[in-house]
Amino acid sequence: MTTRLSIKTTEGDIIIRLYDETPGHRDNFLRLAKEGYFNGTLFHRVIEDFMIQGGDPDSKNAPKGKMLGTGGPDYTLPAEFVYPRYFHKRGALSAARTGDDVNPDRESSGSQFYIVWGKTYKPAELKQMERQMELQQEQEIFNQLAKQHHEQIMDLRRNRNRAGLQELQDNLIEETKKLCRQNGKPAFTSEQTEAYT
């Protein structure tokens, strides 16, 4: 079942859907909306072709130029990602959160949300992005393998054993290729390709 709500703005209404697959976020958003929490708040962060962000209670009657984006209730919500079924595409509603470097559990803001404005791409651009994801996957796997062989690498370097280093590097590259084949190439789903083109 999908819950639909209307966000009334000075530019017109925005119809949003809340999904049962994300019950914590759905219930929180509904509760805040029913309490009037969002009434009078602004879309305080608008980035063309990216997203519009709202839900900061500090934006109510905020004077022009006030820094916004840190307000909210005194709680966060556990992550509820349902990827690849739901993903960032034009019109998607998502909970705002701080970055992974300071928020490794990927917890969401208790009230702030954003709507993906989105950008469309040419098929060739999506293919290039897939190639970039593939290269990133290869680099991450290689780095993990190299980390596992750190002491061996350091010993070979200390002993200036270039042949040994080259042999180890070749072995790590082959192991990387093997693991990449097992994992499969990163690729956009047909739904993502349709949404982004």
Describe every region a protein language model picked out.
Residues 1-197:
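Cyclophilin-like peptidyl-prolyl cis-trans isomerases
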